[in-house]
């Protein structure tokens, strides 16, 4: 595949992290939003499920458009939608309006994921692409945790409305900056018109490995974001932790993610360990972490422990999972679409839509399991982690059949 321009890694980072930081800042304010609109926590959490559905719709449509019209104009369009919907959210008179605005906000910000990944594949190939993903992934976890800290301070010292002020300003700044310096990386603009979109769609839908990769990404990100939408109610509401301190706790997950990312990069670049072995190691970390989380959550339901001990019992297992997350997911993204180089945007849009629908389903389940007990979501996470390991095992079987 020819390369016409390379998007700098820092610009990819901005695209990749815009949605995660938006969601983690927002989730810090879920208890406050629940109180403001005089509703229940389960209803408020559904705003996150709708966010991921809007994200899935954006990925499905905007990825296709980037194949036809180019990556750059679609990114600028998405950032514009993101900024406008954030402004609307500030003045939402009820929870239903906020739900709709969040859906539209997610549709716009989805360009950061689907177009960002397409631009990465346009710009880098092979082991260089793996290294770029592995190098960026620690920051993909650090910055969202920074979002929890920012959100915690905003909620503690002002109100949830100012989180959307932050989003609208961020979107406007990025839109202005990218209008000036964002390169066009798609070397096959209009290619998808001759390749026939529905023929590509048919191939993608029949690709078993792609569906399994989508399940793994959806499950792991569902665990990640599911924890973020449940954690504020556990720590701020139940344990009476200050919102700003809760934001600081989120950095524990960042440190684990950074370690996992650097470990993955080291194993690939310095030790020349095959990507598949790195992915298996990631699954091992995740299953162990989610198992411990389920055990600890069940213990906390039956026994009274100190606040500090309870925090450790909840965050330490999640840190193990996050190490595994950052060992596995970058490589999953690298391999899932390697056979779709000329239709990366189209294939990526279908792929991304699948796993974001799964993320929406997981967060919806978390909202439905939301109760006075904290063991429900932890058991769900364990099921998802083990199921992901089974899915990856089946991918290896399909890969071996492909070689023979």
From Swiss-Prot:
Membrane topology, as annotated: Multi-pass membrane protein
Transmembrane segments: 3-23, 43-63, 73-93, 95-115, 135-155, 162-182, 216-236, 248-268, 280-300, 309-329, 346-366, 377-397
GO CC aspect terms: plasma membrane
Keywords: Cell inner membrane, Cell membrane, Membrane, Transmembrane, Transmembrane helix, Transport
GO function term, MF aspect, one: xenobiotic transmembrane transporter activity
Main subcellular location of this protein, as a coarse class: membrane
Subcellular location: Cell inner membrane
Protein's recorded name: Uncharacterized transporter RBE_0856
PROSITE patterns the record matches: MFS (PS50850), SUGAR_TRANSPORT_1 (PS00216)
InterPro entries xrefs: Efflux_drug-R_Bcr/CmlA, MFS, MFS_dom, MFS_trans_sf, Sugar_transporter_CS
Family annotation (Gene3D superfamilies): Multidrug resistance protein D
Recorded family membership: Belongs to the major facilitator superfamily. Bcr/CmlA family.
GO BP, sorted A to Z: xenobiotic detoxification by transmembrane export across the plasma membrane
